[in-house]
A protein has these predicted regions:
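Post-DEXD/H (motif II) to motif III coupling segment of the RecA-like Helicase ATP-binding lobe
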Residues: 241, 246-308
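Conserved helix/coil segment N-terminal to the catalytic DExD/H
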Residues: 193-238, 252-257
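Loop/turn-to-beta-strand initiation segments
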Residues: 157, 207-210, 238-241, 263-268
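Conserved RecA-like helicase motor-core motifs
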Residues: 181-198
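N-terminal accessory nucleic-acid engagement/regulatory domains that precede
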Residues: 1-80
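Conserved pre-motif I regulatory segment
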Residues: 76-135
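The Walker A (P-loop) glycine that initiates the GxxxxGKT/S ATP-binding motif of P-loop NTPases
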Residues: 135-137, 246
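Conserved Walker A/P-loop ATP-binding site and its immediately adjacent core
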Residues: 139-178, 217, 276
Length: 312
């Protein structure tokens, strides 16, 4: 069989998503069931951490789950001779407009360890071929500094995604404090009209190095105009690295962004709380991150760390 496009393959593995083409949501009941959360108010099952596109008959799954497990589930529904898979390694991105240099060295061994992990140095070299990284670091230990160093060292256009606009402003000021980046090289993407203008003329964003955006901005635009437009936005901006601040928050939206921007070279999930407060959601969150290389830099004797107790 001759495959004319990537969509002709049954299973496609991207940098931050696995896509099953030409399928129905009911084709893989045991697989889908793992992502179900019982809604006590509406008395129904809601699915998080996955997405199904009924128009194109495509199922989006997290890249962090076992690929072989997914393959077996898909193969069980069809003739093995008809199964086909493809690993997509596009890695199209732009370099920063000019070199970004750090103003200060890591302040302690925790930051050094986080940087070695995030940059796949030393004992973490084995992760060089990976595309997703989870850095679990206590608040106040320098999440913004770590992200700044990674962006500076790799020299690739990046985006920081947070839950609130005010937090983006804090990121902006901290990054300028830690690096020599010029304020004009940082762009805060606000509102659908701005995204529309970028999609119509991406040259207006030429010579930029860092983009800042909230979950709600991307969620609103994706829900209104289609999530493929969010993927196109990242492509037009030449983004090669995305940072999710407090990755455990806005979990489903984070998943949808990962699926839409599945060919972004690297994704960093940075959080001080690598878990969800709801027990069912926490199980799915951990499944989402199952095979994502992660590092926990918490010191239980020193660091104040949040523990959740579910009250039923």
């Amino acid at each position: 069989m001759v495959y004319k496009s990537i969509d002709d393959y049954k299973m496609v593995v991207h940098n931050s998503s696995i896509i099953i083409n030409h399928c129905k949501l009911t084709d893989f009941p045991t697989l889908i069931r793992q992502f179900g959360v019982w809604d006590k108010v509406c008395h129904r099952v809601n699915y998080i951490g996955i997405h199904y596109d009924p128009e194109k008959q495509r199922l989006f799954l997290p890249r962090g789950i076992d690929v072989d497990y997914v393959r077996r589930k898909v193969e069980s529904t069809m003739d093995p001779d008809e199964f086909s898979s493809y690993i997509a390694r596009y890695n199209h991105y732009d370099k920063v407009s000019k070199r970004i240099r750090m103003k200060m060295l890591p302040r302690d061994d925790v930051q050094k360890e986080a940087l070695n992990f995030g940059l796949c140095k030393g004992k973490y070299y084995c992760n060089s071929g990976k595309t997703q990284f989870a850095i679990n670091l206590t608040t106040g230990k320098g999440k913004t500094y770590i992200a700044s160093c990674i962006m500076s060292y790799l020299g690739i256009r990046s985006i920081v995604i947070t839950s609130q606009s005010g937090i983006l402003d804090q990121w902006r000021e901290k990054i300028k404090e830690y690096t020599d980046i010029d304020d004009s090289e940082i762009v805060k993407i606000e509102g659908g009209p701005m995204i529309g203008r970028i999609l119509n003329d991406s040259s207006m964003m030429a010579n930029k190095s860092l983009y800042l955006c909230t979950h709600s901005t991307l969620q609103t635009y994706g829900s209104t105009h289609g999530w493929d437009k969010v993927g196109l936005l990242f492509e037009k901006l030449g983004i090669g690295i995305k940072f999710f601040d407090e990755a455990h928050q806005n979990f489903q939206n984070m998943a949808l962004i990962d699926f839409a921007t599945r060919d972004v070279w690297r994704t960093y999930y940075i959080t001080a709380t690598p878990s969800r407060s709801d027990r069912q959601e926490d199980i799915i969150y951990k499944l989402y991150m199952k095979n994502v290389p992660s590092i926990n830099l918490f010191n239980p004797e020193v660091d104040a760390h949040t523990s959740y107790i579910e009250i039923k």
